[in-house]
Design a protein with these regions (language model features):
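Nucleic-acid processing machinery
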Residues: 2-334
Length: 334
């Protein structure tokens, strides 16, 4: 089992195929290898890839789903005419999804090993890997224009107040339209007084529980009963969004992430746990990709920053962009 060639996503990114064909080939070869090597984690990995394939192939439901999200956009435009806000939706990109899957394997095995000085069973690992709920995600980003509130601190406070206000109504609004909110199971439980008690168990609050890299956001997961799939909603102020997209949470975080991954590699003796070894190696290979050298249909890059992604390989597929600019650019709002 140890000697077999390890199948990686990187092997399929240089032949001009579409993202869908890449997924198909990768999942097929990984499954064959998993069966012949009796690698149960690779079988779970295959099911994960098939889930993404299914999303890309049968995505008609996204029209109906994003229509319901749009109703919340209309509600906000009516309730908060003085706020600027944007709604964005995306299907997680193939490279990010693959990185996240392998990252989960590495993180879970490392944490388990640190605690118990042994490795988790495949069943335990399988349970952990069964919780991908954010392949589809929508984000609401709000901003209070300067012309309404001059003072920076006061503006930030107002935005956070409105963010929690929106969080308080979002759950019921979507549940009335065929979604079911998933309890967060105590993860990043909010301590904010602005969040209503009855919705608190459903939110993961990265505002009252800021990540070390400065990432701040409110997350809630829903099950779409008509599409039979999960989707995540993220709520951020523009400042929080900037930190996530172009700030330390994006760049410095990358350096720190590599450092902590190397620390995990050093802690787990090579050859003792093939699931860790392979997931770590796959993750490292993805991080070392030179995007300009890839040959994928509808994808091009000049370097790892200048990217034109028309297929959801690296950036994710856009479902909806809606922008609402504050209607009152001159009048100060009381």
């Amino acid at each position: 089992m140890q000697g077999a060639h390890m199948i990686t996503l990187n092997d399929y990114l240089y032949s001009g195929d579409t993202v869908f064909k890449i997924l198909k080939k990768y999942a097929h070869d990984l499954q064959e290898s998993a069966v012949s090597n009796q690698n149960e984690v690779d079988l779970i990995h295959c099911r994960f890839l098939m889930q993404i394939m299914d999303l890309l192939e049968h995505n008609d439901f996204l029209t109906a789903q994003s229509q319901k999200i749009r109703e919340f956009y209309k509600y906000m435009a009516k309730e908060y005419p003085y706020l600027s806000f944007a709604f964005k939706g995306r299907i997680k990109s193939l490279i990010r999804a693959e990185a996240k899957f392998n990252g989960y394997v590495v993180e879970y095995i490392y944490d388990y090993y640190e605690k118990h000085a042994t490795y988790p069973s495949v069943v335990e690992l399988g349970e952990k890997l069964n919780c991908f709920r954010d392949l589809i995600a929508y984000r609401i980003v709000i901003s209070m224009p300067k012309c309404h509130v001059k003072d920076k601190k006061e503006r930030e406070n107002q935005e956070i107040k409105y963010l929690y206000e929106i969080a308080n109504v979002l759950k019921d609004f979507l549940e009335e339209r065929g979604f079911t909110a998933e309890p967060a199971g105590g993860v990043k439980k909010s301590t904010s007084k602005l969040l209503r008690e009855e919705v608190r168990p459903y939110y993961r609050d990265y505002i009252t529980n800021v990540d070390p890299d400065g990432y701040r956001s409110l997350h809630i997961t829903f099950f779409d009963n008509s599409a039979k799939c999960y989707m995540e909603m993220q709520l951020r102020t523009k400042q929080m969004d900037d930190i996530a997209e172009i700030g330390p949470a994006n760049h410095l975080g990358y350096e720190k992430k590599q450092e902590s991954e190397r620390r995990r590699r050093d802690a787990i003796p090579k050859g003792e746990c093939i699931y860790f070894d392979e997931a770590y190696e796959r993750g490292m290979q993805l991080q070392q990709l030179e995007l300009k050298n890839l040959d994928v249909n509808m994808f091009a890059a000049v370097n790892n920053s200048l990217i034109n992604d028309g297929c959801g390989l690296y950036r994710g597929r856009l479902i909806l962009p809606y922008e609402h600019l504050s209607r009152f650019q001159n009048d100060l709002i009381d």
